[in-house]
Amino acid sequence: MNQQATASQKTRAEQETENEANRLREQIDTALAAVAVRSPDEIESLQSAADRIERAARDLSDALRQLAQQRKVPEI
């Protein structure tokens, strides 16, 4: 099954959860790249990365909770 067909079968909550998970992965990758750079200028970058990861993790948690709630409600 192609990706477009699979995407059309996902609910909005599933798509949002997947998007938030991907965003968190991207933030983690960016943070890991910042860890590899050792310079005084990178201190602020590391702190910013931590803030972005916290926000992305919260957004993913919210999306997962919404998805769980949606799946509790039986479809008619």
Question: For each of these PLM feature ranges, what is it?
Answer:
Residues 33-76:
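Short, charge-rich amphipathic interface segments used for partner binding and complex assembly
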Residues 2-38:
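N-terminal acidic leader/helix
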